[in-house]
Each structure stands twice: as structure tokens, then as C-alpha cells.
């Protein structure tokens, strides 16, 4: 017969292995320290941009914040293919939001028909 210690050792190894195979584990790509450093870099980039806007406003007069700046990049994204947005609802959610959805559809359909 197999000793109790061997059975206990196999159980201790087998149980976590089974749990690990059944769960969807999240493996972080970045460590907590790396995330903090990246956030700090983003903050410093934001401060540099605001500083450059402030310096320009001193040289050229007040700068309108809504006015695009060359450094920020004036790229406009244009869709080349039709975009379809979908939503899944169960019957209870549909009953709950039916009036709001009908209102949105009635607003959107005349706009598309006019085009």
C-alpha cells in the first residue's frame, strides 16, 4: 500500500494544479513599480506641454486652449469603413430600457433619412 505521507504530498501538489488549470489567471505584464514610472513619465509630459503653452502665451499673447497646437499633432481620424455598434441585452434589460431605446431610435432614424 501507499503510505499516507505520499498520498498527502500528491494531494498537496494535485489540488493547486487542478485549481490553476480551472481558473483564468491574470498575469501582469508590468510590475507595480514600472506602472508608477510610466504614470510619472505621462505626468511629466503633460507638464512639459502645459509649460510650452504657457511660454508661448507669454511671447505671443494669450493662447486659446481649444486652438490646436503643432506639437500635439493635428491628426483627424477618418473611418474608411462603416462602423457598426452593437449591444446585447436580455429580456429583462430590454423591458427596462425599451422606452429609452425607442426614443433614441426615433431621434436617429429621421437624421439618417434626411441624409
Curated annotation (Swiss-Prot):
Highest taxon, organism lineage: Eukaryota
Molecular function GO labels: hormone activity; motilin receptor binding
Annotated signal peptide: 1-25
A single GO cellular-component term on record: extracellular region
Localization: Secreted
Predominant place of localization: secreted
S-S bridge residues: none
Annotated region (Disordered), positions in chain: 40-74
Keywords annotated in UniProt: Cleavage on pair of basic residues, Hormone, Secreted, Signal
Family the UniProt entry places it in: Belongs to the motilin family.
Reported function: Plays an important role in the regulation of interdigestive gastrointestinal motility and indirectly causes rhythmic contraction of duodenal and colonic smooth muscle.
Name this polypeptide is given: Promotilin
Organism of this sequence: Macaca mulatta
Amino acid at each position: 500500500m501507499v503510505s499516507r505521507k505520499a498520498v498527502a504530498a500528491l494531494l498537496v501538489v494535485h489540488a493547486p494544479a487542478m485549481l490553476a488549470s480551472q481558473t483564468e489567471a491574470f498575469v501582469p505584464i508590468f510590475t507595480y513599480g514600472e506602472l508608477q514610472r510610466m504614470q510619472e513619465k505621462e505626468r511629466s509630459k503633460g507638464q512639459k506641454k502645459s509649460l510650452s503653452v504657457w511660454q508661448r502665451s507669454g511671447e505671443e499673447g494669450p493662447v486659446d486652449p481649444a486652438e490646436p497646437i503643432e506639437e500635439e499633432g493635428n491628426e483627424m481620424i477618418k473611418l474608411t469603413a462603416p462602423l457598426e455598434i452593437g449591444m446585447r441585452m436580455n429580456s429583462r434589460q430590454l423591458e427596462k430600457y425599451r422606452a429609452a431605446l425607442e426614443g433614441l431610435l426615433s431621434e436617429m432614424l429621421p437624421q439618417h433619412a434626411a441624409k
